[in-house]
């Protein structure tokens, strides 16, 4: 599951890598693991997440699903932490409003400043959800989030497209979670002298911590 969320690998490649290690499963099993365990790992990590910043860059990109495009609303804070992602079949005020409401609920932070492009959906959405936030629009201000989109688009490009919105949401959530875990936005995976993982990078140590937490639950 970690390989799938971290690297640009299809399910069939994960199956092959597991087979090399003596684990024989089919692609549907890997798919089921990703859908089932991704929310569990995210929930287990939640108490260890660094607090999200109050300066948000928000934008939408698109991913392929069942032969059509759907919109991925995303936000990062001033430190580069992925705040949230919300998938929608529409690109309108209702979708933007739902995104802001979800992002605030999940992060438990209300932004002081939000930068967006000039899409007409954002001002009414912000007035409805976080009217106290300062709103800035402009191309320069959006460069960071537009660059950040490439991580998600690169990951989804190696797939053959999603079939259901809910399944796509889990994978996009997991991708952002994995980015944050690797980049140190959780108090997990810090060096602890564990002889089993003396040279392991932060992500592997953090994943090991979470796996032990879930196993003990």
Predicted regions and their residues:
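Mobile genetic element proteins and their domesticated derivatives, centered on retroelements
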Residues: 14, 30, 59, 75, ...
